[in-house]
Amino acid sequence: MVPCTLLLLLAAALAPTQTRAGPHSLRYFVTAVSRPGLGEPRYMEVGYVDDTEFVRFDSDAENPRYEPRARWMEQEGPEYWERETQKAKGNEQSFRVDLRTLLGYYNQSKGGSHTIQVISGCEVGSDGRLLRGYQQYAYDGCDYIALNEDLKTWTAADMAALITKHKWEQAGEAERLRAYLEGTCVEWLRRYLKNGNATLLRTDSPKAHVTHHSRPEDKVTLRCWALGFYPADITLTWQLNGEELIQDMELVETRPAGDGTFQKWASVVVPLGKEQYYTCHVYHQGLPEPLTLRWEPPPSTVSNMATVAVLVVLGAAIVTGAVVAFVMKMRRRNTGGKGGDYALAPGSQTSDLSLPDCKVMVHDPHSLA
């Protein structure tokens, strides 16, 4: 077991449309935190179906009870909430004892704050059958003990956890837990998926874009954003000329957006002027095909000014050309040139028709009267 991995799992989890077949998961995250001098330990249970929080219990609430966190859970009757509340309160008492027990296992004083965390749940495939079950414990942010994939044996992270392992082996704890994971857990997951299908079975595709950030020494950071997607599983990669940049890429954990969707970004540092050689690739089940993005530089102010100047010059040239053409036409007509329809009026002189007079006539339509 790798130390301190469970804490990262907990942090990542807490943190319309197409439909999808699976897999799906039912998970419970449990946290008990001692706080010497401030009363009893705080105890919390948070339930997730896939990436959606649907129930919560908090011992610090004004009236600690199991509460719905998704609208579709309002279908459950009062007996459900009473039963789950009593179970949570029983678990709360057990974890208070566990916190005191672990102080002895690790030879720790009673003056400090300590934390027990648990992740427990099951995952089913598109056919509704169990793919895997799990139950893992952490103490003060590091792995303590975990049920193995065979659902029959345990792995202890240190000597203190070996004490717990021996006790659970003698009590047949793995057999009891396996029955829950293969039976009760799967049954409730199917029920929740049915009740919340409009929300849980949806797929929201990511909205992606690339931003540009200046750095010293002729470097820039390109950051690829994926926003508003569900479910949370997504992959972002950067490539240079078709080759993935794994070691040079900075990647943040997928984060809840607060509206039931998720967000994530990945960045890479590149030489200034070489941005167009780098591409971001986004993979998500809500996309018909992966997205490929480059940084698109906005039109510069200089470029805009040049464009305006060109348009002004062209416009002036067109107007001038039209005026000149009109003047020449009028001159041909007044001098009896080929194609002229007008004869000179008696006493008129061709030298009296000048360009300035024509300009006035062109720009002042009322002079035609």
UniProtKB/Swiss-Prot annotation:
Membrane topology, as annotated: Single-pass type I membrane protein
Region (Alpha-3): 204-295
Region (Connecting peptide): 296-305
Stretches that traverse the bilayer: 306-328
Pfam family for this entry, one: C1-set
A single GO BP: inner ear development
Region (Alpha-1): 22-111
Localization: Membrane
Region (Alpha-2): 112-203
Lineage top rank: taxon: Eukaryota
Annotated InterPro entries: Ig-like_dom, Ig-like_dom_sf, Ig-like_fold, Ig/MHC_CS, Ig_C1-set, MHC_class-I_related, MHC_I-like_Ag-recog, MHC_I-like_Ag-recog_sf
Example GO molecular function: peptide antigen binding
Parts of the chain on the Extracellular side: 22-305
Disulfide bonding pattern of the chain: C122-C185, C224-C280
Side of membrane Cytoplasmic, spans: 329-369
Annotated glycan sites: N107, N197
Signal peptide location: 1-21
Gene Ontology cellular-component annotations: external side of plasma membrane; lumenal side of endoplasmic reticulum membrane; MHC class I protein complex; phagocytic vesicle membrane
Chief site of localization: membrane
Described function: Involved in the presentation of foreign antigens to the immune system.
Subunit (UniProt): Heterodimer of an alpha chain and a beta chain (beta-2-microglobulin).
Family to which the UniProt record says this protein belongs: Belongs to the MHC class I family.
Name of the molecule in the record: H-2 class I histocompatibility antigen, K-B alpha chain
Organism encoding this protein: Mus musculus
